[in-house]
Amino acid sequence: MPKLEQFEIKKYWQIFSGLKPVENKLTHDQVLPILFNSKLDTSILNKIWFLADIDDDDQLDFEEFVICMRMIFDMVNKNIDSVPDELPDWLIPGSKAELVKQRKTERSSGTAETSSVVNVPTSSPAVDDYQKEVDWYISRDDKSQYESIYESAITSRDNSVSYVSLSSAVRSKYINLSSQDLEKTWRLVNPKLDTSIDKDPALYFIHILRQVNDYACPIPSHLPSALKETFTKTRVSTDLSSKQSEVRRPTLSTSNSSSYQIPKRGGTDFSVTQGTDWEVVRLQRELANIDSELSSAQQQSTSHNDSNDRMKLVKQQLEQFLEYQKNLVNNSNTSSESVDVGGLRDDIESIEQQVQMLEEYLKTKKSELHNLKIEVQSLY
């Protein structure tokens, strides 16, 4: 596995700053789009997150973000076959070396305590083989305790909890748990492998892990049918990054989902980070569409202006002709036998009707022109 290069770190910094960190840290929700776009299995992503989050605060500073990104790239590009159980020395930041050592010590001590509980020496082989199974019943006192842990892990408005936040809260309460225990239990209570779960599966997640911690109970391989039916019910998600939200915002999810794609070339390919400013690209496209519509409206407005000018000229000519005909009638000294007065009146009435029709047509066109001007102004 090649070590970090300076150009990699610069590229990671561009991605990190583009995600708008708060106090130089990113939450799990901010990093979630990158994690999902990697197309890696949830269990792999969870393990990468745990390794990268050295200080266990459910956030990544830049050094931790570099660790997370590098391990994702190496898994995607198949530079490594699996996520290591511990960080390699060359990937550990100097400022966090002590924290890494402390974490290793805590895990090893927790494993030793668990082993001492499970492997109790006894003279009876039958007792050795016996392990207490998980009790699915939750008492009132236990439920109150679990709810307290659950509420401390809530990070979203719909009161659902993510794997990272809930696991961190459970670990702070029960220390004899391994990452494998947490991951296996999460998959058990989350059959649909959603990014977050509701209160009921969260309480059973805590309930199972408490018994694993206190009594070294083996994690069940399946749920009781009643619980499984409850946990697999479709939950309405309010998370904008979820698939349900794609129905409401197809432009964003379709045209911009490639901001972090799986590289096709061998080795660590950082070209996938290009195009992270997809919002700017989308706005530029919308601006180009608006400019096109504005240009079209202006052309229509110009054509209507030309048409109005022609209508004014025709009206003026007809009015002049009408005036000429009236003068002929008024100034004519010939007798009624020699002049067809009735025919002239018919001609005058016909011309007046035509002028009236043209005036109505002109009025209609002026109304259309006025509406077009309003549309043009609204586009600015």
UniProtKB/Swiss-Prot annotation:
Coiled-coil zones: 278-379
Membrane topology term: Peripheral membrane protein
PROSITE patterns reported for this sequence: EF_HAND_1, EF_HAND_2, EH
SMART domains found in the cross-reference section: EH
Region annotation Disordered: where it falls in the sequence: 102-122, 238-271
Any one biological process term the GO annotation gives: endocytosis
Annotated Ca(2+) binding sites: 53, 55, 57, 59, 64
Protein name, UniProt field: Actin cytoskeleton-regulatory complex protein END3
Naturally occurring in which organism (per UniProt): Kluyveromyces lactis (strain ATCC 8585 / CBS 2359 / DSM 70799 / NBRC 1267 / NRRL Y-1140 / WM37) (Yeast)
